[in-house]
UniProtKB/Swiss-Prot annotation:
Reaction equations catalysed: GTP + H2O = GDP + phosphate + H(+)
Modified residues (N-acetylthreonine): 2
Keyword list, A-Z: Acetylation, Autophagy, Cytoplasmic vesicle, Endosome, GTP-binding, Hydrolase, Isopeptide bond, Lipid degradation, Lipid droplet, Lipid metabolism, Lipoprotein, Lysosome, Magnesium, Membrane, Metal-binding, Methylation, Mitochondrion, Nucleotide-binding, Phosphoprotein, Prenylation, Protein transport, Transport, Ubl conjugation
Protein name: Ras-related protein Rab-7a
Length: 207
Protein backbone atom coordinates (compact mmCIF):
# COMPACT_ATOMS: atom_id res chain seq x y z
CA UNK A 1 0.00 0.00 0.00
CA UNK A 2 1.49 3.29 -1.10
CA UNK A 3 1.49 6.11 1.40
CA UNK A 4 -0.41 9.24 0.42
CA UNK A 5 1.62 12.38 -0.01
CA UNK A 6 1.29 15.01 2.69
CA UNK A 7 -1.33 17.61 1.88
CA UNK A 8 -0.77 21.29 2.69
CA UNK A 9 -3.89 23.44 2.61
CA UNK A 10 -3.49 27.20 2.37
CA UNK A 11 -6.31 29.15 4.01
CA UNK A 12 -6.59 32.96 3.89
CA UNK A 13 -8.55 34.93 6.51
CA UNK A 14 -9.80 38.34 5.33
CA UNK A 15 -11.87 41.12 6.85
CA UNK A 16 -11.65 44.62 8.27
CA UNK A 17 -9.18 45.45 11.01
CA UNK A 18 -10.47 44.55 14.48
CA UNK A 19 -13.08 41.93 13.49
CA UNK A 20 -11.14 39.17 15.27
CA UNK A 21 -9.22 37.39 12.51
CA UNK A 22 -6.10 36.85 14.65
CA UNK A 23 -8.19 35.85 17.68
CA UNK A 24 -10.10 33.23 15.67
CA UNK A 25 -6.87 31.78 14.31
CA UNK A 26 -5.26 31.67 17.77
CA UNK A 27 -8.34 30.14 19.35
CA UNK A 28 -8.46 27.40 16.71
CA UNK A 29 -4.74 26.59 16.61
CA UNK A 30 -3.61 27.36 20.18
CA UNK A 31 -6.89 27.36 22.16
CA UNK A 32 -5.98 30.81 23.48
CA UNK A 33 -7.67 34.22 23.57
CA UNK A 34 -6.20 37.60 24.49
CA UNK A 35 -8.18 40.75 25.30
CA UNK A 36 -5.20 42.86 24.22
CA UNK A 37 -5.71 44.03 20.66
CA UNK A 38 -2.64 44.20 18.45
CA UNK A 39 -3.08 44.95 14.75
CA UNK A 40 -1.47 42.47 12.36
CA UNK A 41 1.22 44.09 10.23
CA UNK A 42 1.38 42.65 6.73
CA UNK A 43 0.55 38.98 7.25
CA UNK A 44 1.25 36.12 9.61
CA UNK A 45 0.36 32.43 9.58
CA UNK A 46 -0.03 29.44 11.88
CA UNK A 47 -0.15 25.76 10.98
CA UNK A 48 -2.23 22.93 12.38
CA UNK A 49 -2.47 19.25 11.48
CA UNK A 50 -6.05 18.00 11.28
CA UNK A 51 -7.93 14.91 10.17
CA UNK A 52 -10.37 15.50 7.33
CA UNK A 53 -12.45 12.46 6.38
CA UNK A 54 -9.72 10.06 7.58
CA UNK A 55 -7.00 12.01 5.82
CA UNK A 56 -4.25 13.88 7.69
CA UNK A 57 -3.72 17.37 6.31
CA UNK A 58 -1.69 20.39 7.39
CA UNK A 59 -3.59 23.67 7.39
CA UNK A 60 -1.53 26.79 6.82
CA UNK A 61 -3.78 29.61 8.02
CA UNK A 62 -2.84 33.10 6.85
CA UNK A 63 -3.99 36.10 8.85
CA UNK A 64 -3.68 39.24 6.74
CA UNK A 65 -3.86 42.83 7.91
CA UNK A 66 -7.23 44.52 7.53
CA UNK A 67 -5.85 47.99 6.91
CA UNK A 68 -6.37 49.27 3.37
CA UNK A 69 -2.73 50.24 2.96
CA UNK A 70 -1.75 46.58 3.23
CA UNK A 71 -4.22 45.28 0.67
CA UNK A 72 -1.62 45.75 -2.06
CA UNK A 73 0.40 42.96 -0.41
CA UNK A 74 -2.29 40.59 -1.60
CA UNK A 75 -0.88 38.81 -4.63
CA UNK A 76 1.97 37.03 -2.81
CA UNK A 77 -0.26 35.95 0.06
CA UNK A 78 -3.41 35.02 -1.86
CA UNK A 79 -1.91 32.95 -4.67
CA UNK A 80 -2.29 29.22 -4.18
CA UNK A 81 -5.04 29.55 -1.57
CA UNK A 82 -7.40 26.58 -1.20
CA UNK A 83 -10.09 28.41 0.78
CA UNK A 84 -10.84 32.02 1.76
CA UNK A 85 -12.47 32.91 5.08
CA UNK A 86 -14.34 36.24 5.24
CA UNK A 87 -14.83 37.61 8.76
CA UNK A 88 -17.04 40.42 10.03
CA UNK A 89 -18.00 41.73 13.47
CA UNK A 90 -21.74 41.24 14.20
CA UNK A 91 -21.66 44.43 16.32
CA UNK A 92 -20.19 46.57 13.51
CA UNK A 93 -22.36 46.84 10.36
CA UNK A 94 -19.62 48.49 8.31
CA UNK A 95 -17.45 45.38 8.62
CA UNK A 96 -20.30 43.38 7.09
CA UNK A 97 -20.77 45.85 4.23
CA UNK A 98 -17.12 45.47 3.19
CA UNK A 99 -17.40 41.68 2.66
CA UNK A 100 -18.17 42.30 -1.01
CA UNK A 101 -14.96 44.27 -1.53
CA UNK A 102 -12.88 41.69 0.37
CA UNK A 103 -14.33 38.86 -1.72
CA UNK A 104 -13.70 40.78 -4.95
CA UNK A 105 -10.19 41.69 -3.80
CA UNK A 106 -9.38 38.03 -3.17
CA UNK A 107 -10.68 36.86 -6.55
CA UNK A 108 -8.67 39.56 -8.34
CA UNK A 109 -5.43 38.91 -6.43
CA UNK A 110 -5.61 35.11 -6.18
CA UNK A 111 -6.93 34.52 -9.72
CA UNK A 112 -8.35 31.05 -8.93
CA UNK A 113 -8.90 28.74 -11.91
CA UNK A 114 -12.65 28.50 -11.23
CA UNK A 115 -13.69 31.73 -9.45
CA UNK A 116 -17.42 30.90 -9.58
CA UNK A 117 -16.93 27.78 -7.47
CA UNK A 118 -13.94 28.76 -5.33
CA UNK A 119 -14.68 27.88 -1.67
CA UNK A 120 -15.39 30.77 0.69
CA UNK A 121 -16.60 30.51 4.29
CA UNK A 122 -18.09 33.49 6.17
CA UNK A 123 -17.75 33.97 9.93
CA UNK A 124 -19.88 36.45 11.88
CA UNK A 125 -17.66 36.95 14.92
CA UNK A 126 -18.14 38.39 18.45
CA UNK A 127 -21.57 36.87 19.11
CA UNK A 128 -20.67 36.93 22.83
CA UNK A 129 -21.26 40.71 22.82
CA UNK A 130 -24.74 42.07 23.56
CA UNK A 131 -24.90 45.03 21.16
CA UNK A 132 -25.43 42.96 18.02
CA UNK A 133 -26.29 44.98 14.90
CA UNK A 134 -26.07 42.53 11.97
CA UNK A 135 -28.97 40.06 11.93
CA UNK A 136 -28.36 36.38 11.21
CA UNK A 137 -30.89 36.41 8.35
CA UNK A 138 -29.13 39.35 6.71
CA UNK A 139 -25.78 37.54 6.77
CA UNK A 140 -27.35 34.29 5.55
CA UNK A 141 -29.06 36.11 2.68
CA UNK A 142 -25.73 37.62 1.56
CA UNK A 143 -24.05 34.20 1.68
CA UNK A 144 -26.90 32.61 -0.26
CA UNK A 145 -26.58 35.27 -2.98
CA UNK A 146 -22.89 34.41 -3.37
CA UNK A 147 -23.32 30.79 -4.43
CA UNK A 148 -24.56 29.68 -0.99
CA UNK A 149 -21.37 30.27 1.02
CA UNK A 150 -21.28 28.35 4.35
CA UNK A 151 -21.95 30.72 7.27
CA UNK A 152 -21.02 30.36 10.94
CA UNK A 153 -21.60 32.69 13.88
CA UNK A 154 -18.58 32.56 16.16
CA UNK A 155 -16.99 33.89 19.31
CA UNK A 156 -13.20 33.68 19.43
CA UNK A 157 -13.38 34.73 23.09
CA UNK A 158 -15.82 32.00 24.19
CA UNK A 159 -14.66 29.44 21.58
CA UNK A 160 -18.18 29.21 20.14
CA UNK A 161 -18.41 27.44 16.75
CA UNK A 162 -14.70 28.02 16.05
CA UNK A 163 -13.83 24.32 15.79
CA UNK A 164 -16.92 23.55 13.71
CA UNK A 165 -16.24 26.44 11.34
CA UNK A 166 -12.65 25.38 10.72
CA UNK A 167 -13.71 21.78 10.11
CA UNK A 168 -15.84 23.03 7.24
CA UNK A 169 -13.01 25.29 6.08
CA UNK A 170 -10.58 22.35 6.06
CA UNK A 171 -13.03 20.07 4.24
CA UNK A 172 -13.77 22.66 1.55
CA UNK A 173 -10.07 23.49 1.19
CA UNK A 174 -9.21 19.80 0.74
CA UNK A 175 -11.90 19.46 -1.92
CA UNK A 176 -10.45 22.45 -3.77
CA UNK A 177 -6.90 21.06 -3.50
CA UNK A 178 -8.03 17.67 -4.84
CA UNK A 179 -9.82 19.24 -7.80
CA UNK A 180 -6.73 21.29 -8.69
CA UNK A 181 -4.58 18.12 -8.54
CA UNK A 182 -6.96 16.28 -10.87
CA UNK A 183 -6.95 19.20 -13.28
CA UNK A 184 -3.15 19.24 -13.36
CA UNK A 185 -2.93 15.47 -13.87
CA UNK A 186 -5.37 15.51 -16.76
CA UNK A 187 -4.77 18.67 -18.77
CA UNK A 188 -6.88 19.54 -21.79
CA UNK A 189 -6.16 17.29 -24.80
CA UNK A 190 -4.06 18.74 -27.60
CA UNK A 191 -6.27 19.46 -30.59
CA UNK A 192 -4.87 18.35 -33.95
CA UNK A 193 -5.87 20.07 -37.16
CA UNK A 194 -7.19 18.07 -40.13
CA UNK A 195 -3.76 17.52 -41.76
CA UNK A 196 -2.15 16.38 -38.47
CA UNK A 197 -4.98 13.88 -37.85
CA UNK A 198 -4.62 12.45 -41.36
CA UNK A 199 -0.84 12.13 -40.92
CA UNK A 200 -1.24 10.42 -37.52
CA UNK A 201 -3.80 8.02 -38.99
CA UNK A 202 -1.53 7.10 -41.90
CA UNK A 203 1.46 6.50 -39.61
CA UNK A 204 -0.52 4.26 -37.27
CA UNK A 205 -1.89 2.09 -40.10
CA UNK A 206 0.55 -0.77 -40.81
CA UNK A 207 -1.59 -3.18 -42.82
Amino acid sequence: MTSRKKVLLKVIILGDSGVGKTSLMNQYVNKKFSNQYKATIGADFLTKEVMVDDRLVTMQIWDTAGQERFQSLGVAFYRGADCCVLVFDVTAPNTFKTLDSWRDEFLIQASPRDPENFPFVVLGNKIDLENRQVATKRAQAWCYSKNNIPYFETSAKEAINVEQAFQTIARNALKQETEVELYNEFPEPIKLDKNERAKASAESCSC
